[in-house]
């Protein structure tokens, strides 16, 4: 299963992008909010975290791209709501995920109905299913558009990816381990130092 793609952009058309990686062109769907934050175009190098979707009813693999693990985790929770599949969710995520998360936590059905394809009944289902589970996204993003991570945060995301996808931590748990490590040692400046501090905290 594909979790991350990095390579050269062959083309962008609407909310579809094709990335050349390892000699293979991968077509990726981008939620509107992700597409709007991407400034790169054909010929540029880019990297996306991938949600891979394939079922008996949908045998053709669908790749959905995100700027960060946090965006992908939000998406995975969002599609846990009955009647919201991955393709519908791609269309619905047309505003920053922080704003959507805040609307869910504040039981703001009206704000959710502004999402493409989301009516009153579905908005109520979203709130009933996800309220109490999305505060971390509202707090982190604060309603601001998602964008490229600052340079100093790039290695944080690398460590987060390894903790979640290779070592089996849940995303929220891994994020907390990283935050605590940085609090203990604010001078951390590399992935190696961050890994050392994370596991020093776990064993200490």
Curated annotation (Swiss-Prot):
<dbReference type="GO" id="GO:0048476">
    <property type="term" value="C:Holliday junction resolvase complex"/>
</dbReference>
<keyword id="KW-0238">DNA-binding</keyword>
<dbReference type="GO" id="GO:0005737">
    <property type="term" value="C:cytoplasm"/>
</dbReference>
<dbReference type="InterPro" id="IPR012340">
    <property type="entry name" value="NA-bd_OB-fold"/>
</dbReference>
<keyword id="KW-0233">DNA recombination</keyword>
<dbReference type="Pfam" id="PF14520">
    <property type="entry name" value="HHH_5"/>
</dbReference>
<comment type="subunit">
    <text>Homotetramer. Forms an RuvA(8)-RuvB(12)-Holliday junction (HJ) complex. HJ DNA is sandwiched between 2 RuvA tetramers; dsDNA enters through RuvA and exits via RuvB. An RuvB hexamer assembles on each DNA strand where it exits the tetramer. Each RuvB hexamer is contacted by two RuvA subunits (via domain III) on 2 adjacent RuvB subunits; this complex drives branch migration. In the full resolvosome a probable DNA-RuvA(4)-RuvB(12)-RuvC(2) complex forms which resolves the HJ.</text>
</comment>
<dbReference type="GO" id="GO:0006281">
    <property type="term" value="P:DNA repair"/>
</dbReference>
<dbReference type="GO" id="GO:0000400">
    <property type="term" value="F:four-way junction DNA binding"/>
</dbReference>
<protein>
    <recommendedName>
        <fullName>Holliday junction branch migration complex subunit RuvA</fullName>
    </recommendedName>
</protein>
<dbReference type="InterPro" id="IPR013849">
    <property type="entry name" value="DNA_helicase_Holl-junc_RuvA_I"/>
</dbReference>
<feature type="region of interest" description="Domain II">
    <location>
        <begin position="68"/>
        <end position="145"/>
    </location>
</feature>
<keyword id="KW-0227">DNA damage</keyword>
<feature type="region of interest" description="Flexible linker">
    <location>
        <begin position="146"/>
        <end position="156"/>
    </location>
</feature>
<dbReference type="GO" id="GO:0005524">
    <property type="term" value="F:ATP binding"/>
</dbReference>
<dbReference type="GO" id="GO:0006310">
    <property type="term" value="P:DNA recombination"/>
</dbReference>
<dbReference type="Pfam" id="PF01330">
    <property type="entry name" value="RuvA_N"/>
</dbReference>
<comment type="function">
    <text>The RuvA-RuvB-RuvC complex processes Holliday junction (HJ) DNA during genetic recombination and DNA repair, while the RuvA-RuvB complex plays an important role in the rescue of blocked DNA replication forks via replication fork reversal (RFR). RuvA specifically binds to HJ cruciform DNA, conferring on it an open structure. The RuvB hexamer acts as an ATP-dependent pump, pulling dsDNA into and through the RuvAB complex. HJ branch migration allows RuvC to scan DNA until it finds its consensus sequence, where it cleaves and resolves the cruciform DNA.</text>
</comment>
<keyword id="KW-0234">DNA repair</keyword>
<comment type="similarity">
    <text>Belongs to the RuvA family.</text>
</comment>
<dbReference type="InterPro" id="IPR000085">
    <property type="entry name" value="RuvA"/>
</dbReference>
<feature type="region of interest" description="Domain I">
    <location>
        <begin position="1"/>
        <end position="67"/>
    </location>
</feature>
<dbReference type="InterPro" id="IPR010994">
    <property type="entry name" value="RuvA_2-like"/>
</dbReference>
<keyword id="KW-0963">Cytoplasm</keyword>
<feature type="region of interest" description="Domain III">
    <location>
        <begin position="156"/>
        <end position="204"/>
    </location>
</feature>
<dbReference type="GO" id="GO:0009378">
    <property type="term" value="F:four-way junction helicase activity"/>
</dbReference>
């Amino acid at each position: 299963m594909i979790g991350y793609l990095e390579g050269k952009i062959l083309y962008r058309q609407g909310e579809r992008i094709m990335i050349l990686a390892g000699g293979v062109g991968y077509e990726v769907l981008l939620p509107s909010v992700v597409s709007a934050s991407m400034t790169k175009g054909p010929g540029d190098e880019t990297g996306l975290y991938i949600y891979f979707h394939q079922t008996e009813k949908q045998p053709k693999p669908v790749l959905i791209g995100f700027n960060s693990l946090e965006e992908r985790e939000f998406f995975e929770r969002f599609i846990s709501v009955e009647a919201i599949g991955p393709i519908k969710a791609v269309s619905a995520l047309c505003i920053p995920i922080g704003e959507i998360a805040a609307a869910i936590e504040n039981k703001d059905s009206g704000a959710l109905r502004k999402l493409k394809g989301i009516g009153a009944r579905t908005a109520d289902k979203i709130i009933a299913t996800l309220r109490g589970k999305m505060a971390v996204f509202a707090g982190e993003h604060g309603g601001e558009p998602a964008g490229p991570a600052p340079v100093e945060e790039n290695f944080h995301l690398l460590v987060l990816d390894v903790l979640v996808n290779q070592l089996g931590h849940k995303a929220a748990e891994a994020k907390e381990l990283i935050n605590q490590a940085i609090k203990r040692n604010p001078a951390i400046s590399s992935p190696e130092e961050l890994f050392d501090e994370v596991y020093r905290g776990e064993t200490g």
